[in-house]
């Protein structure tokens, strides 16, 4: 008996988390640039592979979280319409982010880097990903 199709979602989550942890820019934006092994610190502390928005951010915390939605094409037994939702949140005291003398919104810098990492690339092995929306909720 083979493995269930749902195991692919687990693999996709791991690939996305790996990309976040391997991005020097995201590592820097999460405040882990001086860490020897950010891949051991970021998952489940600064990035959650599920929809997670903390109730109250009491410290100057920053989070890059994500969720996956996928529909199964039962005729071909493959996932189609795979959607990755990123939830980028931070404490209000760190929204303003200064880089090389220029002020940005922290979450705008994160969004740009996520776009650089994932757009028009086949990271998950299911075809190229595309930015569909950049609308906050």
Residue ranges of each PLM-predicted region?
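Short conserved micro-motifs at the rims of enzyme active sites and ligand-binding pockets
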Residues: 77-78, 98
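Small/polar-rich, solvent-exposed N-terminal microdomains that initiate assembly or binding
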Residues: 1-76
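Generic short beta-strand segments
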Residues: 68-71, 89-91, 134
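Short regulatory "switch" loops immediately downstream of catalytic or recognition motifs
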Residues: 25-29, 90-95
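Oligomerization/assembly interface segments of phage tail-like spikes and tubes
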Residues: 78-93, 114
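Short histidine-centered catalytic/ligand-binding loop motif
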Residues: 94-106
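Acidic-leaning, charged glycine-interspersed low-complexity segments
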Residues: 27-28, 57-60, 105-137
């Amino acid at each position: 008996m083979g493995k269930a199709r749902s195991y692919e979602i687990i693999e996709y989550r791991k690939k996305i988390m790996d990309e976040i942890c391997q991005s020097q820019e995201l590592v820097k934006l999460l405040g882990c640039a001086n860490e020897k092994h950010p891949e051991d610190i970021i998952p489940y502390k600064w990035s959650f592979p599920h929809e997670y928005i903390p109730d109250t951010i009491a410290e100057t915390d920053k989070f890059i979280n994500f969720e996956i939605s996928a529909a199964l094409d039962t005729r071909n037994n493959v996932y189609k319409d795979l959607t990755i939702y990123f939830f980028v949140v931070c404490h209000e005291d760190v929204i303003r982010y200064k880089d090389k003398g220029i002020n940005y919104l922290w979450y705008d810098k994160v969004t740009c880097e996520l776009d650089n990492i994932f757009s028009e690339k086949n990271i998950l092995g299911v075809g190229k990903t595309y930015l569909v929306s950049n609308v906050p909720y």
